[in-house]
């Protein structure tokens, strides 16, 4: 056998290979096999590797987003940051530092996902603890990481279509490249199976071979060729599986000969992708217009339902005769599903609207129209299952429209009676008077509550709150119409309820016409809000049978009077109603209204110059340190266990809307200024009195905390201004005190919030002068022998008559020990009060006396316990001896005699100890009586000295 055949080829027969040993040629290590050599190897660049890593991570992020796996999204995002850091040199080199569009698009999608997940509080509650934690971490890291891509993100938000086109091109190129590779592999492998001919250099389509040897192999190629012929009919795989051609595919089919089908398909897909991305940016209210545009383009809109039906079921059969009974039965059938678990609330509203259209078309009368519209209102109320949450704005606008139309029907047809006292069996729809079961007042009360919820949900500092506040005009108009309707019915209880709703929208609003009418600037027949409130409240006082409505009406009436400076009317209402005694038994909403009334009453008293009354009104609110919570204007942060989640949720529901808030800084400033005007003269008058009481604990704490500071700078906050003014007043410097209270900063913060700010500022300066004068006299009365009244008037810029009246009042009240000399216009001091050294000596003597008494009581307690303990011990010994004697009665006489002698000796010792104790007690009693006698003599001498001084003063 020749050496040629000894080498062994792949085409040798089995017999030849078995008969001769095959001599294999040694192959170098790390060489590729024949099969691997046949496959074309691709060498990827660094750019392709980095971009492929990024695309894989982006795909994993999208997959994790679909299932809301926040932990995996966070992990993938961290991998993305590391991968992009590695790819950054390639981006700087290949893209000239421009961020790849696929990266920008992925970041934008992730930003939308993170924001939506964070804003959706309900879904966040359903997340696990790890996912919640991962979402917070992801949000922080993403917001920090996204700062470097702000410009790219803005460009993407402005034109997302450009980014979508490039991504589609990349995907199409990848698909095209993969298809070409598959074709190349088939071309290279298939001829090897078909024949042993030499392969051509260029890849060509495989044709079936007619040889008999290859007939078995050729069947596969035939099937492939036939399938490829069938596939050739379609431009793409997408067209193959389409149920019917669309507009886009028709355009592709009718493309000009110069443009290939693939290119036309690319353009069409890019166009639709850009439209889809742009639609994502549109608001929800434009979806209806988008659907209309899609219908024009050839899309078929399918409205899915729970039952899977594509069309809305018909209300009645085609040949059915529509009458009142049929419509009412259908209405009852629709409303029977109200409140059930699987009821589609949106579809229920649509059913009712369709039923309303049918009733209007067949002209079934006003009663049926009122019944259907009232049920539509109820269905809209039921659409929001959350009691505490506010309804959507689209439902709110529809609710306003439906109630307005319903009221028009009720006011236009006086023979239609809508009342909840009418039973379903006695409803009348055909003949007048029409009777329908329902309560318009309840619907309006629910509407008012929903309006309040909407205001609470909005940010008070945004334009949205202003827009929602504009809805108060239609709400108040609806209440006015219901007032007219209820007054026509004549039910007193319902009239009181709707009057109270009208009061709730009126009591906190300031009417400048009231003050103008008081000054004579308006005609006398002008009806102001005060007169309107007086009429409404008086009716409730007379007709209401429940305490709650009457109490709320009184509180609102007082609030409105105080708001318009009717101080005496407001004060008399408070005193006559005795609300302060029974308010603790009221519900929380009424207690909040009471707190608001007291705050506004305090402001009114301050504007009228009644400083003491203002302080008394505000002290209960400010002493607690929680005026914000007491007025329902927000929650103060508390410790973890002081307030549970349920309590916090309930308190948030009780909060007042922002436009009804009372300025807390204004309240605190008025309270502190009132406390300063009362506390500083009192402190000066009772400087050496150890038992003096504090008028205002809060003001006293502010003053003491300021005195403890080693370095005190110029005042900045409102509290610091008041404390600085108080320090100036203690020295009698009224000018500095007034400058601290009335200045540009304080005017902006506080005083300009009053209606007549200039009058309030003048009133405060007048009181500061008067109280500074009183403080000056209390502080320096022991220094002067006499003081000139004109000098005091000039010093404090007060008229002489005012200074004279102030000093006379102080002398009459025995606050100042002095006398007025009218001819010389001087104040003569009587020197009745002790000097500073004498006062300190008397304080020291009192404290030493109290200390001695306390020590004596402690000593007596200790000595008494000691002696009592010894006596008990002797008594116990007696009992023991007596018990021993009883036990030893049967013993011999000697032992009994010894025990008796021992007992006698013990009794003798106990008697001596008792005599000594009595002697000690008598001695201590004598000493205590002697000291008490000395103290009594000292007190009598001091009282005699004071009586002599008083007599001298009187003379």
From Swiss-Prot:
Has the keyword Nucleotide-binding been applied to this entry? no
Alphabetized PROSITE patterns for the sequence: PCI
The question of whether Cytoplasm is a record keyword is answered with yes
Q: Name one GO molecular function term.
A: translation initiation factor activity
S-S bridge residues = none
Keyword terms: Cytoplasm, Initiation factor, Protein biosynthesis
What does the entry list under GO cellular component? eukaryotic 43S preinitiation complex; eukaryotic 48S preinitiation complex; eukaryotic translation initiation factor 3 complex
**Segments of skewed composition (Acidic residues):** 162-183, 219-229, 288-297
Q: Name one GO biological process term.
A: formation of cytoplasmic translation initiation complex
Give residue spans, biased composition: Basic and acidic residues.
Answer: 230-250, 911-955
Which HAMAP family does the UniProt record give?
A: eIF3c
Q: How does it assemble?
A: Component of the eukaryotic translation initiation factor 3 (eIF-3) complex.
According to UniProt, the name of this protein is Eukaryotic translation initiation factor 3 subunit C
- Species of the source: Anopheles gambiae (African malaria mosquito)
